A protein has these predicted regions:
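Positively charged n-region of N-terminal signal peptides that target proteins for export
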Residues: 1-9
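Surface-exposed intrinsically disordered loops and tails
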Residues: 108-113, 208, 238-241
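Glycine- and acidic-residue-rich phosphate-binding/metal-coordinating active-site segment common to enzymes
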Residues: 155-235
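Conserved, mostly hydrophobic/aromatic
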Residues: 89, 140, 188, 314
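C-terminal functional modules
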Residues: 213-340, 353-356, 360, 364, ...
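Metal-dependent phosphodiesterase/phospholipase catalytic core, i.e.
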Residues: 90-95, 100-173
Length: 373
């Protein structure tokens, strides 16, 4: 009798375990690029989440296509692939904000002299995605490029986009927000300075004003700066409680082989959950950005990401769903995810010589890819 009872208990325990494992696996399988954040504990702070992102995010139709182009997906395409950190560079001209890469304009259309891409277009993609997927958030690194308007840049952006639609934005700078605080919102990571008389920690955006410019050839030049805000009080540490950390690897001048040394070393380093850890994998040295990205992304796909280990934000060139998935799947998923949603159909609009330029580009990229395999 006792033996039967013991066997029954063991079988019941095994059944519970198997159901739990099956449930977790099924839960994992229900996660994709549209809904992965909804499966993460909302009390987790955004600095404690592994987030795929994109470098120079809006360059899919940059003017000098093979030199300035660092992405092959539109903003919407990147969102549905799983990217949640976006490097958005804007030129202020009057009250307009144009998407640029250095002095080069990004376009809505493929080809020469297409319609210029603006912040309105980018924000529209973010808004549409978050409306369909309210369990997600978007981290937007907001940077002025090409123009130099000082504090007028953020003031103009705030008045045009944030103030009229305040519920869409997270712009506090007084603590590290939890995921629940950011769900359904665009989180501003502000690169530029602000007018201190107009803005304070309630509306200035999370300050990335100390983001480093790493213009050298060192493979282990990782920069740490302070982000002045209040750290969460529920964690014990020796550092002062008035700031969080910004920990960055962005040695863009390294050739791909050395760049990978920098990336892999940074990923292997222990990160603190109150740091904004940002690893930018792009390389501007040697060949084209596409060739460099093929080499680095291949190694990133092979990297042994550990489930539950903190890597932080990983910002890549030429992101796709497979690569983004490798990064976000390293998170611990504790919640039942929201239903996945499909990416909207995108219509390609060709400007002057657009089809010809696209064909030449595709042939060129195919040839480049042969040298990587």
């Amino acid at each position: 009798m006792k033996t039967k009872r013991v066997v029954s208990i063991i079988l019941a325990a095994l059944l519970i375990i198997s159901v739990g494992i099956t449930g977790f696996a099924a839960n994992d399988e229900a996660i994709d690029g549209s809904n992965w954040m909804s499966a993460i504990d909302g009390e987790k702070r955004i600095t404690a989440i592994n987030i795929p992102g994109t470098h120079d995010s809006a360059t899919v139709n940059a003017d000098t296509n093979t030199v300035s182009r660092t992405q092959s997906l539109s903003i919407a395409g990147q969102l549905y692939a799983g990217a949640r950190y976006f490097d958005i560079r804007l030129k202020k001209s009057g009250k307009s904000f144009y998407s640029v890469h250095s002095v080069v304009y990004n376009r809505k259309d493929v080809g020469l002299f297409g319609e210029k891409l603006t912040a309105d277009d980018i924000i529209a993609d973010f808004r549409a995605f978050l409306t369909k997927n309210p369990g997600e958030t978007v981290l937007m690194l907001l940077k002025e490029e090409s123009s130099r308007t000082g504090t007028d840049f953020y003031t103009g952006f705030y008045e045009k986009y944030i103030e009229p639609e305040s519920d869409l934005w997270y712009v506090r700078n007084d603590h590290i927000p939890t995921l629940d605080e950011c769900r359904g919102k665009i989180v501003i990571l502000r690169y530029n300075s602000v007018d201190d008389e107009r803005f304070d920690n309630t509306n200035s955006g999370i300050s990335f004003n100390g983001y480093p410019y790493i213009n050298n050839y060192k493979t282990k030049d990782f920069r740490f700066t302070q982000v002045y805000m209040t750290k969460p009080e529920d964690e014990t540490r020796e550092e002062p409680s008035s700031y969080a950390g910004l920990y960055v690897q962005d040695s863009f001048r390294l050739a791909p082989e050395k760049k990978w040394m920098a990336v892999s070393s940074f990923l292997a380093n222990v990160k603190k959950p109150w740091w904004f850890s940002v690893c930018v994998t792009s390389s501007a040295a040697g060949s084209s950005p596409y060739y460099n990205a093929l080499l680095i992304n291949k190694k990133l796909m092979e990297y042994p990401f550990e489930k539950g280990r903190l890597y932080g934000i990983i910002s890549v060139d030429f992101a796709d769903a497979e690569l983004c998935g490798r990064i976000y799947q390293s998170n611990d998923f504790t919640n039942e995810p929201n239903a996945a949603t499909a990416a909207p159909e995108e219509t390609i609009v060709y400007a002057c010589l657009g089809e010809f330029i696209e064909k030449v580009r595709n042939v060129l990229f195919s040839v480049i890819a042969l040298f990587v395999k």
